[in-house]
Amino acid sequence: MQRANHSTVTQFILVGFSVFPHLQLMLFLLFLLMYLFTLLGNLLIMATVWSERSLHTPMYLFLCALSVSEILYTVAIIPRMLADLLSTQRSIAFLACASQMFFSFSFGFTHSFLLTVMGYDRYVAICHPLRYNVLMSPRGCACLVGCSWAGGLVMGMVVTSAIFHLAFCGHKEIHHFACHVPPLLKLACGDDVLVVAKGVGLVCITALLGCFLLILLSYAFIVAAILKIPSAEGRNKAFSTCASHLTVVVVHYGFASVIYLKPKSPQSLEGDTLMGITYTVLTPFLSPIIFSLRNKELKVAMKKTFFSKLYPEKNVMM
């Protein structure tokens, strides 16, 4: 019977935006601008690194990989979300829902793994500068990036296959703006729902907490090494190479902890939806801004690469 019920569910209905119908046009315009800025900002970072030879280093290779993961993550969720804001028909096919979950989880976890790799890169650069070229060889960097992407794809496959092997009984309304795990679990039925929920939660928490602890460990060694530098100028210079990455980590895990660790309440549907949207849209939106403004080397390269071409007469005067 469970498999029969499962086979009858051919589509779901996303009702996350129905809690504030009067704001949908304003939200559409706001999210569209943020989405376009996210794409443009990350493409600008990638183009700058590609065109500026001085940025052909492991740190900026990882930054480009991070930009790719952010572009793909937003593309997996936001275009569909924008279409739903303008439509009264918010149904999504079963396979489309599974695909959205797979790609969003894959690129989301890839993003977390790459942030961990970037923390390790900064640890090697500051704590073992003489061995940096050996430890961060081109082959080693490619391996770290490849493992991050492979790990993200494996996580996406594990979570998606676990959720969509469940039986769904009758109800089709997903109280979210995307195909997300908690609202889909509420639609599932059968004796294995609780086991799957605990298993998926354990896998996701273990992966994210492991990444966070590795980043904390890297920065513990980094801070200890920076404090041993005798001059204030040297300490500031060393810390400046980590500032943008550390800020993105705080934003990424800060928003995630507020959303996923806060107590759930049946009366907080609007708040949960808004916080979920904030994490999905605002975090990728802020990331290129942080890296562009807080990374002096990247900021100078952007001005040299693009500003000088747009305003050559000002470049001559400089």
From Swiss-Prot:
<feature type="transmembrane region" description="Helical; Name=7">
    <location>
        <begin position="273"/>
        <end position="293"/>
    </location>
</feature>
<feature type="topological domain" description="Extracellular">
    <location>
        <begin position="161"/>
        <end position="197"/>
    </location>
</feature>
<dbReference type="GO" id="GO:0004930">
    <property type="term" value="F:G protein-coupled receptor activity"/>
</dbReference>
<feature type="topological domain" description="Extracellular">
    <location>
        <begin position="1"/>
        <end position="25"/>
    </location>
</feature>
<dbReference type="InterPro" id="IPR000725">
    <property type="entry name" value="Olfact_rcpt"/>
</dbReference>
<feature type="transmembrane region" description="Helical; Name=3">
    <location>
        <begin position="100"/>
        <end position="120"/>
    </location>
</feature>
<feature type="glycosylation site" description="N-linked (GlcNAc...) asparagine">
    <location>
        <position position="5"/>
    </location>
</feature>
<keyword id="KW-0812">Transmembrane</keyword>
<dbReference type="GO" id="GO:0005886">
    <property type="term" value="C:plasma membrane"/>
</dbReference>
<keyword id="KW-1015">Disulfide bond</keyword>
<feature type="topological domain" description="Extracellular">
    <location>
        <begin position="76"/>
        <end position="99"/>
    </location>
</feature>
<comment type="similarity">
    <text>Belongs to the G-protein coupled receptor 1 family.</text>
</comment>
<comment type="function">
    <text>Odorant receptor.</text>
</comment>
<feature type="topological domain" description="Cytoplasmic">
    <location>
        <begin position="294"/>
        <end position="318"/>
    </location>
</feature>
<keyword id="KW-0675">Receptor</keyword>
<keyword id="KW-0552">Olfaction</keyword>
<keyword id="KW-0297">G-protein coupled receptor</keyword>
<feature type="transmembrane region" description="Helical; Name=5">
    <location>
        <begin position="198"/>
        <end position="218"/>
    </location>
</feature>
<dbReference type="GO" id="GO:0004984">
    <property type="term" value="F:olfactory receptor activity"/>
</dbReference>
<keyword id="KW-1003">Cell membrane</keyword>
<feature type="transmembrane region" description="Helical; Name=6">
    <location>
        <begin position="239"/>
        <end position="259"/>
    </location>
</feature>
<feature type="topological domain" description="Extracellular">
    <location>
        <begin position="260"/>
        <end position="272"/>
    </location>
</feature>
<feature type="topological domain" description="Cytoplasmic">
    <location>
        <begin position="121"/>
        <end position="139"/>
    </location>
</feature>
<keyword id="KW-0325">Glycoprotein</keyword>
<feature type="transmembrane region" description="Helical; Name=2">
    <location>
        <begin position="55"/>
        <end position="75"/>
    </location>
</feature>
<keyword id="KW-1133">Transmembrane helix</keyword>
<dbReference type="InterPro" id="IPR000276">
    <property type="entry name" value="GPCR_Rhodpsn"/>
</dbReference>
<feature type="transmembrane region" description="Helical; Name=4">
    <location>
        <begin position="140"/>
        <end position="160"/>
    </location>
</feature>
<feature type="topological domain" description="Cytoplasmic">
    <location>
        <begin position="47"/>
        <end position="54"/>
    </location>
</feature>
<feature type="disulfide bond">
    <location>
        <begin position="97"/>
        <end position="189"/>
    </location>
</feature>
<feature type="transmembrane region" description="Helical; Name=1">
    <location>
        <begin position="26"/>
        <end position="46"/>
    </location>
</feature>
<keyword id="KW-0716">Sensory transduction</keyword>
<dbReference type="GO" id="GO:0050911">
    <property type="term" value="P:detection of chemical stimulus involved in sensory perception of smell"/>
</dbReference>
<protein>
    <recommendedName>
        <fullName>Olfactory receptor 10H1</fullName>
    </recommendedName>
</protein>
<dbReference type="InterPro" id="IPR017452">
    <property type="entry name" value="GPCR_Rhodpsn_7TM"/>
</dbReference>
<dbReference type="Pfam" id="PF13853">
    <property type="entry name" value="7tm_4"/>
</dbReference>
<feature type="topological domain" description="Cytoplasmic">
    <location>
        <begin position="219"/>
        <end position="238"/>
    </location>
</feature>
<keyword id="KW-0472">Membrane</keyword>
<keyword id="KW-0807">Transducer</keyword>
